[in-house]
Regions:
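The conserved Walker
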Residues: 52
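Short beta-strand-centered segment that lines the nucleotide-binding/catalytic pocket of NTP-utilizing
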Residues: 70-85
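ATP-dependent NMP and nucleoside kinases share a basic, alpha-helical "lid"
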Residues: 135-186
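Small-molecule kinase domains that catalyze NTP-dependent phosphoryl transfer to phosphate-bearing small molecules
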Residues: 186-203
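Hydrophobic positions on the alpha1 helix immediately C-terminal to the Walker A/P-loop
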Residues: 59
Length: 203
């Protein structure tokens, strides 16, 4: 069984690599072909969605690494969580942050439209520890490629209609859980117990 599982994991990883490469090839073909430039607008907008821990960040990183430096803008959907500073601290942990209502879709759509029109934006920042929006923002200039990445990046119809390419990333549930625990404990300062409880409750 262990040997079989080992080979299955290898095959899945190979398939994953091939899939990412195919996506990158499609992006390059669309963005830099004469047909694309005459058929679509100059800016290419990509939406990448998928469950937590599914590998969205890896796909995004591979895309950015494969395109010319300085040509990609990343808009993480997590940056557009609604501010929860008005909610008592003890109640914030009960908020389902994987529900569409947790995001400020209007602001995200507005920022994408501003970038399309050639304007810069001030991207909000969000703290996973306090579950609140931070006063600091990130100045973003329009680029050739805009990537919108998040668990529900393809959920909102208005935002989805702005996208030229839509990608959904999936992975085995057990593998996703391992990735989520590693990420949230190391990068977001949460305990393994808290991650497990949240994973079984809302993810």
């Amino acid at each position: 069984y262990n040997v079989f599982y080992h080979y299955v994991v290898i095959l899945m990883n190979c398939f994953y690599i091939c899939l990412v490469n195919a996506i990158i090839a499609l992006i390059v073909m669309q963005k830099y072909s004469i047909w694309f430039k005459y058929t679509f607008k100059e800016m290419l907008i990509i939406g990448i969605a998928g469950g937590t821990g599914s590998g969205k960040t890896t796909v995004v990183r591979k895309i950015i690494e494969s395109l010319p430096a300085g040509e990609v803008v990343l808009l993480p959907q997590d940056s557009y969580y609604k501010d929860s500073s008005h909610v008592p601290v003890e109640e914030r942990q009960n908020i389902n942050f994987d529900h569409p209502d947790a995001f400020e879709w209007s602001l995200l759509s507005k920022h994408v439209m501003m970038l399309k029109e050639g304007n810069s934006i001030e991207q909000p920042t969000y703290s996973y520890l306090t579950c609140t929006r931070q006063p600091e923002t990130i100045h973003i200039e329009p680029r050739e490629v805009v990537i919108i990445e998040g668990i529900l990046a393809l959920c909102d119809k208005k935002l989805r209609n702005m996208m030229d390419l839509k990608i959904f990333v999936d992975a085995d549930p057990d593998e996703r859980l391992i990735r989520v625990i590693q990420r949230d404990v190391i990068e977001r300062g949460r305990t393994a117990e808290a991650v497990m409880e949240r994973y079984t409750r809302v993810l």
